[in-house]
Amino acid sequence: FHVLLYRFLDRTGKGLRTAPRDALIAESAPKEALGRAYGLHRSLDTLGATLGPFLAFLLLPLLGFRGVFWLSALPALLAFLLLFAVRETPRPPSPLPPLALGHLSPGYRRFLLVSGLFALALSSNAFLLLRLKELGLSQAGVALAYALYNLLYALLAYPLGGLADRVGLGRMVATGFGLYALVYLGFAWARTAFWALGFLFLYALYSAAFEGANRAYLATLVPEEAKAGAIGLYHTVVGVLLL
C-alpha cells in the first residue's frame, strides 16, 4: 500500500511540475534557440535516468533499499532549493480564462489534434523490450540494450535540438512522426534480435529528435500570457489519450 501511495505521489508531482517547467524553459531561452534548450533538458534528464539506476545498483549492497531511497531524495531536495534562485519575469495576471481553448491560436489547436492522434499510437518502451526478448535476446542483453538506448538518446538530444533550430522545429517534429512509424514497422518486420536492435537504436534517434523539438515547437504556438496553461492542456490531452 505504501509503495502504491508514494508512486501515486510521484506521478502527481510529475504532473504538477511538467507544464511550469516547460514554460520556464521557453521563457528562459531565446526563441531561435528553443530546440537546443529543450534538447539540453532532455539530454540531462535522460542521462540522469540512465546513471541513477546504475548508481542505485552499486549502492544497494552497501545501503540497502531504504538507504538508496533516502539517498535518492537528496537530488530532488537540492533541485527544490535551487528553484528559489530562479527569478521569473514579472507580468500582469493573464486576461484569458483558464484553459479557454477558443482563445488559443488555430496552430495550437491543430497541433493539439495531431498530437492527440499520435498519442493513440504511442506505446510503452516495455513493448519494444519484450519484442527483443521474444526474438531471443537474454534478460541481461535486453537491460544492456535499453541502457545503450538511453545513452544514445542523451548524447543526441542536444545536437539534434540545435539542428531543429536550423531546419525548423515543425520539420523536425514531422521527421519524428515518420521515424516512429518506421521503428514500429521495423519491429514488426524483424525476425532476429540483430535487426530489432538496429531499430531500437533508430528509436533512440527518434526520441532525441522528437522529444525536445516537440516541446520547443509547442512553446512557439502558445501566447506568452497563457503559456503554462496551454502547455498543461497539451500534456493533459496527450496523457489521457496515452491511456
Segments (PLM) and residue ranges:
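Juxtamembrane intracellular "pre-TM" segments in multi-pass secondary transporters
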Residues: 88-115
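Transmembrane alpha-helix termini and helix-breaking/packing motifs in multi-pass membrane transporters
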Residues: 51-69, 243
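Symmetry-related core transmembrane helices of the 12-TM Major Facilitator Superfamily/SLC fold
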Residues: 67-84
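Helix-loop junctions at membrane interfaces in 12-TM secondary transporters
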Residues: 1-6, 188-199
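Helix-loop boundary and gating motifs at the non-cytosolic
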Residues: 108-145
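Cytoplasmic helix-loop-helix junction between adjacent transmembrane helices
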Residues: 6-47
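Helix-to-loop junctions at the C-terminal end of transmembrane segments
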Residues: 60, 156-168
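Structural signature of the two symmetry-related core transmembrane helices
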Residues: 73, 171-186
